[in-house]
Amino acid sequence: MMKIVHFVLSESFAGIEQHVDEVLTNFSSHKLILICNESIASYFDKSINIYKIKNFGRRSFFGKYQLKKLIKDIDPDIIHTHGSKTSSIISSIKTKNYKHVATIHGVKKNKKIYEKADLIIGVSDKALEGINHEKICINNWWHPKLKKIQNKKNKHALAVGRLEKVKGFDLLITSWKNIDANLVIIGSGKERNKLNELIEQNNLSEKVKIIDAVKKEELLNYYQDASVLIISSRDEGGPRVALEALYLEIPVISTDVGHMSQILPKELLAEKNNQSALQDMLEKYVDNIHLYNQKAIFNFVETEFSIEEKMQELNDAYNLLASKS
């Protein structure tokens, strides 16, 4: 059994951190350990073996020295980093005593940071585009603790995510002017005021609402009331929220980002960062989504994007990497 350290160094517990938490609580083939920033340690599952450290910058000599000392004490076989910062740090202090696996969670312009790792994992094929190195795609998965919804109410369309430009909520709001359905956007972030102004400018205050990010348990209530989930991202590695909705048998329409082209037919995909294309698709399908049978898509996601399937793929990747030493 190998000893594998996962390393995250974030100021907030968001998508990447949830991904890591689910790996650490659902992977049983090897011994897993977490090194993370002390400010987010309490958000991880209490069963996880956690080493808490203070956050530090990529160029901090003292921070790297302390981390290198901790890694030597743990003596791992593999260190698995998540995101560019931790990948850069490990690449700069790595020794021959362990292998380095790095996961790319989004679509990044600068991917050279990752190429010093022994293996690069992408959450979608698009996240790995331009990587000329040992790489493998292991898609995101639907949340392992989700329970199927029994009584759907179809009260509103739903969009979920950080209120940042990359999520394309400005494009979504602008595209909503001719749609009858109400839209609920759930998320927090720096774009909130701009988005609320856009709602006012387009006279959509009666139809479009923004609600602060909620915990997973409360989000289920919004899923239960949703007729459709909309992904409007300008770019994205692999939208987890789409997998969750499809597992819960909520129809999804999306921009062509991440793994969505593996899941949805072309007619339910709009060109990314194209407001006109998004509006055309929304006007065609949002108010009539109940006429489009996505049962085959629901079944595909439940089977192919389960956490059990992805943990087996991750275990295979670890074992293959170890066999090359």
PLM regions: where:
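N-terminal strand-loop element at the rim of the active site
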Residues: 6-63, 70
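A conserved mid-protein helix/loop that constitutes part of the nucleotide-sugar donor-binding site
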Residues: 14-22, 155, 159-178, 190-196, ...
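Short His-centered aromatic/hydrophobic patch
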Residues: 60, 81-87, 104
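Short alpha-helical donor nucleotide-sugar binding micro-motif in glycosyltransferases
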Residues: 71, 213-214, 221-226
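Donor nucleotide-sugar binding/catalytic pocket of nucleotide-sugar-dependent glycosyltransferases
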Residues: 116-148
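Aromatic "clamp/platform" in nucleotide-sugar-dependent glycosyltransferases that forms part
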Residues: 234
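Short hydrophobic beta-strand element within catalytic cores of glycosyltransferases
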Residues: 251-254
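Conserved acidic donor-binding segment of nucleotide-sugar-dependent glycosyltransferases
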Residues: 267-276, 283-289
